[in-house]
Swiss-Prot record:
It comes from the Eukaryota. The FG repeats are interaction sites for karyopherins (importins, exportins) and form probably an affinity gradient, guiding the transport proteins unidirectionally with their cargo through the NPC. Transmembrane segments: none annotated. It is found in: Nucleus, Nuclear pore complex; Nucleus membrane. InterPro entries: Nucleoporin_NUP42 (IPR051767), Znf_CCCH (IPR000571). Residues 24-73, 200-221 are annotated as: Disordered. Probable component of the nuclear pore complex (NPC). GO terms for cellular component: nuclear membrane; nuclear pore. Required for the export of mRNAs containing poly(A) tails from the nucleus into the cytoplasm. Coiled coil: none annotated. Keywords: Membrane, Metal-binding, mRNA transport, Nuclear pore complex, Nucleus, Protein transport, Repeat, Translocation, Transport, Zinc, Zinc-finger. This is Nucleoporin NUP42. The gene is nup42. It comes from Danio rerio.
Length: 414
């Protein structure tokens, strides 16, 4: 590939996309010095000049041409070595990427973004990073975390600590944003030192920080105790103190997800399944989290897994009546017949335990009594109108006149 003459002169407009070679370092001079003399007055994309038109005379045209070519190459070698190939317009971009970020530009960016953050009404409780490191003084909280803290405070009967904590965090955010928006010289020095520091950034204080935050031992997000043993989902989570209830436990002492419990909440990872009282750590008479049957006032405190008493009840069980989805796999059949697996209750309590109930939410032991009722699988002939009976007896239904009730049992062909 020929060497680019304009690159040697320092004015190649194509840069790295040039079709000719751009030698780097000391290769250019060595490459041209090792070339054989040429009668064209040079090589590459240089223009040949007639030696007779120069001051050398016609008799020495060949020799003059060779001398001129070598002389031009030597001159260009000196020019290229002095220029150091810095005329490439794309090298400035590489130098900019390799260099450090401009400090003043970074500070101006921080000030503008603080102004936008303060006036735009965006979510305030969020961290902030200008380049690749976080700026201290901000706390990261999502709306769901605040909502959970509100529900926890409301369940305890006192929401004033929650209100005070949110107001304190909002005031801290406003003061920090105002400080970064109107930086003093000391603030600029501290921000620059923080951006250039190699140590990990200090974590922002959470709800459980000293002061009127979201409490110390009662909060689920950053309590003061750091020495409590870690637990799964049910233990003292998120750094809470010992003997405190977890935020996400199904068996807290005071929460919306479970009833009162005199013991420490165990949750998924502790001894909830080994205790006689269950339902994810709750005692049997209390309400479990996601069960389908309400608590029976006279039921026995047997072990109740998924079938214990529920806060999301679909049917309230009374003292002589079975709960819907209540008993285990063996119960009187949900549709009237007896015993799927051997015990008696409507779909049973937790996985096979006995229940004093006899009836089911899906049906009773009456059997044929419900099959002929309007709420069963079939409809009696006496309850159908002549038009409906005619439609059931026809080979095809008439559009717009299809009955909305089940057909009689004697018209079904199995």
């Amino acid at each position: 590939m020929p060497v680019c003459n304009f690159f040697l002169q320092g004015r190649c407009r194509y840069g790295d996309t040039c079709w000719n070679e751009h030698p780097t370092g000391g290769r250019g001079g060595d490459y041209r010095g090792n070339q054989q003399p040429s009668n064209r007055g040079g090589f590459g994309n240089r223009v040949w000049i007639n030696p007779s038109q120069r001051g050398g005379g016609g008799s020495s045209s060949a020799g003059g041409s060779n001398e001129w070519g070598r002389g031009a190459a030597s001159a260009r070698d000196v020019q290229s070595s002095e220029f150091s190939f810095s005329q490439n317009r794309f090298s400035a971009l590489e130098t900019q990427r390799a260099g450090a970020e401009d400090t003043h530009t970074t500070l101006d960016t921080i000030q503008k973004e603080m102004e936008v953050w303060q006036t735009s009404g965006q979510w305030p409780f969020s961290c902030y990073s200008a380049v690749n490191r976080q700026i201290s003084g901000f706390i990261e909280l999502c709306p769901e975390e605040l909502r959970l803290e509100y529900y926890t405070s409301r369940a305890s009967g006192d929401i004033q600590p929650y209100i005070n904590s949110v107001q304190q965090l909002a005031n801290q955010w406003r003061s920090r944003v105002q400080e970064l928006r109107n930086m003093s010289s000391s603030t600029q020095i501290s921000v620059i030192a923080e951006l250039k520091s190699s140590s990990p950034p200090a974590s922002a204080p959470g709800f459980g920080s000293p002061g009127p935050g979201f409490g110390s031992a009662t909060s689920g997000f950053g309590n003061t105790s750091l020495s409590s043993p870690p637990a799964g989902f049910g233990g003292a989570g998120f750094g809470s103190g010992p003997q405190s209830s977890s935020t996400f436990s199904f068996a807290q002492s005071k929460t919306d997800f479970g009833a009162s419990n005199t013991q420490q909440a165990s949750g998924f990872g502790s001894s909830a399944f080994a205790q006689p009282s269950s339902g994810f750590g709750n005692p049997a008479p209390s309400a479990a989290s996601f069960s389908f049957a309400a608590a029976d006032s006279e039921s026995k405190p047997s072990a109740g897994g998924f079938g214990s008493a529920s806060g999301f009840s679909f049917k309230t069980a009374t003292a002589g009546q079975g709960s819907g989805f209540g008993s285990g796999f063996g119960s009187s059949s949900g549709f009237g017949s007896s015993s799927g697996f051997g015990s008696s209750s409507g779909f049973g309590s937790a996985f096979g335990s006995a229940a004093p109930a006899q009836s089911s939410s899906f049906g009773s032991t009456g059997g044929a009594a419900d099959t002929q009722s309007g709420h069963g699988l079939f409809t009696a002939n006496s309850e159908l109108t002549p038009e409906e009976l005619k439609e059931f007896m026809a080979k095809r239904f008439t559009l717009g006149q299809i009955p909305l009730r089940p057909p009689p049992a004697d018209l079904l062909m199995i």
